[in-house]
Amino acid sequence: MASRASELPPGSGRSVTAGIIIVGDEILKGHTQDTNTYFLCRTLRSLGVQVCRVSVVPDEVATIASEVNSFSRRFTHVLTAGGIGPTHDDVTFEAVAQAFGEELKPHPELQAAIKTLGGEGWEKLSMVPSSARLHYGTDPRTGHPFRFPLVSVRNVYLFPGIPELLRRVLEGLKGLFQNTAVQFHLKELYVAASEGSIAPILSEAQAHFGRRLSLGSYPDWSSNYFQVKLILDSEEKEPLEECLAYLTARLPQGSLVPYQPDAVEKAGEAVYKLAESGSCLGKKVAGALQTIETALAQYHLSQLCVGFNGGKDCTALLHLFHAAVQRKFPDVPKPLQILYIRSISPFPELEQFLQDTIKRYNLQVLEAEGNMKQALGELQEKHPQLEAVLMGTRRTDPYSCSLSHFSPTDPGWPSFMRINPLLDWTYRNIWEFLRQLFVPYCILYDRGYTSLGSRENTTQNPALKCLSPGGHPVYRPAYLLENEDEERNSRM
């Protein structure tokens, strides 16, 4: 039997539940990272469906069948992901048939769809449990009906394991799962205090509000801005507002941080808003953006790259460049390019920050080794289309006082235009910009380093050394350095 997504009525009860079964040896063996669970849970939650259980099972018919049978009796909906395809280890259809005591039979519509798609060797996909239903949703990318349907058996929906396909199918068939009786409300709070220190307050809050809301506490050891994320979750708005007031009155004063988790995604909006604010920092931002916009007018994106070594200055520059490109080209066709000159013995934390930054900003890394002159030569040889490099240089940096915003390389050097948007910025400007916009930066700066090089020539800045409440020596974060002239005291 076939149906359109709209033909099945959405959930109408207050409680609609779901269980998710992820199928695949590759997940259990660590060969493939599971991203489907996150997407399924988040989407179902937005549809008013409470996900109660997630199970990961191997490509074994009996194991899958047992889990499907159990889940189907316990939850309103069961969604499986994976194990659908033409090969020997694609056994989900067979397992679901076994779970309900049915036979596998060829389905005429699936046979026709496979023939239309020209799927040679995919005949196995037409063999489904005898009571299978077919659901033809609308592809959110094209607006056209899917050419191959989603198969369901009773309350079990069999999704493909390929993340891109799974997302498109669920987006196109949301109506199958929509629970109009419930809308979950969520609020995230960010606390700059240790989880242990606020645990009694959180316990009191949960006891006070009881079943009216759920209060989750999640420590984060890598954030530059908070130590704990709190998630308030309820079917009603009122308990969230009441709990927010309750926590605000009891948490340590100033510990709630107005953190913006989507600082990179919304960089264009936030950076330009700051530039137009008229503040002292805003004027510096406006000047830097003007330099970057001039560069974007003179060069194609493929001719530009950002010099990036993970330091605070180039992190600020990258965020500015990303914001300007985001504003000028809302749909950038390819990743932004960065030049990374690998040092002989980099900090592991710096290497990790580089990898995180590549993902956050969707970057293409042009890697080189040696000193700056050697690196530029290697860059020119490997990427002859490049003509200009944006640098995070400030006038207070060594040998930089005579530079201009657009400075060609010196005679005898590989020919590039050096673009210096931050030339007139100060150490304080850099930190005000990063911290005000919640831009992620290397965690070493929170441990007392103020200028980063390699492990051989970089130490914590003695100007930031102090004693903890327990009398142990610790280092304050780099943004608290009072005398900017002591910035490079980290370097040996």
Swiss-Prot record:
GO CC aspect terms: cytosol; mitochondrial matrix; plasma membrane
Stretches the record annotates as FAD synthase: 303-460
KW Transferase (keyword) present: yes
Entry's localization field: Cytoplasm
Keywords of the record: Acetylation, ATP-binding, Cytoplasm, FAD, Flavoprotein, FMN, Nucleotide-binding, Nucleotidyltransferase, Phosphoprotein, Transferase
SMART domains: MoCF_biosynth
GO molecular function: ATP binding; FMN adenylyltransferase activity; identical protein binding
Recorded catalytic activity of this chain's protein: FMN + ATP + H(+) = FAD + diphosphate
Similarity field: In the N-terminal section; belongs to the MoaB/Mog family.
Domain-related comment: The molybdenum cofactor biosynthesis protein-like region may not be functional.
Function: Catalyzes the adenylation of flavin mononucleotide (FMN) to form flavin adenine dinucleotide (FAD) coenzyme.
Name of this protein: FAD synthase
Biological source species: Mus musculus (Mouse)
